[in-house]
Amino acid sequence: SAITFASTATLMDFAGGWRAMPIKLPKGDLALNLAGHYSVADQTLVLNSLRMSAPFASATGTGRVVFGAVPTISAAKLIFRDLPLEIAQAHLPPPLNRWSYSGQAQASLELQGPWNALDVTGRVESSMLQVRGDDIAVASLSVAAPFEWNKLALRFKDIKVQATKIVYSPNQRWQAAADKLQIGAAFDYQADQPLKLSGRIDGSGMKFKSADDSKVGENLSVHGPFELIADAAATSVSLSGKFSADSGELLWGKFFGDLKTQKPVLELNADYTRNSDRLDCRRCNLALASVGIVAVGGAVDHFSEPPNVRLLASSANFSPGGFFEFFLRETFNRQFPLLDKLAIAGQMAFRLQLNGPLNALGIAGDISLKNGELRAKSNDWRIGPIALDLPLQILLADSKPAAAGAPRVGTLAIERIRFANQTIPPITTTLSLSNNALRLHQPIHLAIFGGEIEIGSLFWPDLLNDPKQVAFSAETKRLKLEELTQALNWPRFSGTLTGSIPQVQSAENLLRTNGEIQAELFGGRIRMGKLEIDNPFSSLPSIKLDAKLDAIQLEQLSQTFAFGRISGILEGSIDNLVLTDGQPSELRADLHSVDRGGEQRISVEALNKITVLSSGEDAGALYGGLAGFFDSFRYSKLGFKATLKNDRLTLRGVESRGDQEMLVVGSFLPPTVNIVSHTQNIAFSELLRRLERINKSDKPNVQ
């Protein structure tokens, strides 16, 4: 027999009476509207219709219950609406159980099995949820989560999570945010067991920054698979995954880079323990498209505070050219414009131990370079192939590290150096990089321009913090000026260049020398000393020096520079000469002829060009008389005194006669000539314009 019924009922304190429910429900009564039939013979209750209303939700459903020693449910279906998320908060793992949730969810359930050991399958859905915690906020969150629950575990399969406007902003710590985040995942949850979550994450518009704003990432697009295990009892989280970034900009101290061209991939297998704030990295590998793969393993203590690291970093396929382009050129080309003119190649390997806090990080290990190359983009010069094996010990800190024992020594071998039409044979030396100091232990010998250049005692006291500070000695031995001027595309002249500079020092933006360079040319000698270079690594270096001229044959000098023909001997000095962008900007000069008993004559062409330089006028109108019968004239004195500063050139002659400054003083014997400087003060830029005109003048201003 069967009993058909339709009734209403109220279950008092429903949540307190049903201990088997996996979720703790709010206290209150449960109101039921039931319709169905009951078979006395089978002790079976069939619910054709169920409507339920309680403080935590409303629901509709159908089902079958067999009453025996333990009531058993079969073919039961329930649809819950307007479920407040607070009912699940206490059952979430830390830190999710400490956040607040606003919004509602819907759930569809299918139940079967003994009343005290139900098997439940279903699906939970929600949209437009909001999440807020002490350090985190989510503006909008939607979730779709199929699940299975039994007495042993709660298992979610194929979870779909979409979140927008996520912000993580703890005080005085790293902060992060994202415009959009999508997660597809599955996880298992058992009471007193670690939560296991695996799936895939896709994020866009992601960004982060350090507490001091020195490290910033923006517009990041990140995606990849992951697996996360959260152990509430041990307060630990294990994360493994492979994450790729398709776009984004990164600012890390002075470095700025666009990740779009590099397609970075981060491969992780790490554990984080909250109580000890420690990250153990079994595998933390970073790959950049043009740089290579860097493998990292070890531990980071005080991870969320100023970290202290104990890591091993290594690579077998590191590209110095890719590193130079991505990390150095764009970051430092304004400070060092020379970088824009360089190209670097080769393959590097390294194995480095990193220890200490990030603001005083110690690095020790070995690096090697094969088939290295350094060249000008214009291909004017090339150094390579280069082979390097270098042990190193450095400290990334503002202050220099304390002195240690004797440094380990490595080797540097350069197979070839090409400069213009010169090729320098192989070079080998030993070197060390210890306590931030880079030292070459053997001199470098360069066979070039028919002579030799020796660079010795090359030393950077603090390569990392002050790379501009360098010291070395230099010695040149009989370089052939004919080959040198040809290589530099200067006017060709012969002679040799010899010099010894026992000390060259560069500090900040100034390079100073202590010594003298001597050039034997034009039949005489030029000695250069007090050489200084201001801003040597900029696009506009300034060179300062003093020069002494002895026994210069004017005939060789004038013919070399196509200035007509002048015979005689020139001597004098040029003090405080400053060259900027290849042009003099300051000098004090006293150059004059010296009578050594030889011929002293000057051609009409040379006279005319001197006249144009001194007056700005061609001498043709003044040329006449007997001068037309001669192509050269005798002189007794020739020269000038000049001072240049701030584009103002003050020009004085080799002899003063009243208010006249004589540039050329004629001899007692004819044919003779005098040239007067008609311009004693002139803009140096105007003098350069006159130089452009001298080839148009062929007659002197004759008195």
Whereabouts are the PLM-identified features?
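Short "repeat-start/strand-capping" segments in structured domains, especially the N-termini
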Residues: 512-513, 585
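Short aromatic-acidic-glycine turn motif
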Residues: 15-16, 596-601
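C-terminal structural cap/anchor segments
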Residues: 576-579, 585-593
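A cross-taxonomic marker for long C-terminal extensions/tails that follow the last structured domain
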Residues: 633-667
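Extended amphipathic, helix-rich lipid-handling scaffolds
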Residues: 1-58, 66-291, 303-377, 386-508, ...
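Short edge-strand/loop segments of extracellular domains
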Residues: 521-524, 592-598
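Outer-membrane beta-barrel and related beta-rich outer-membrane complex signature
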Residues: 379, 599-609
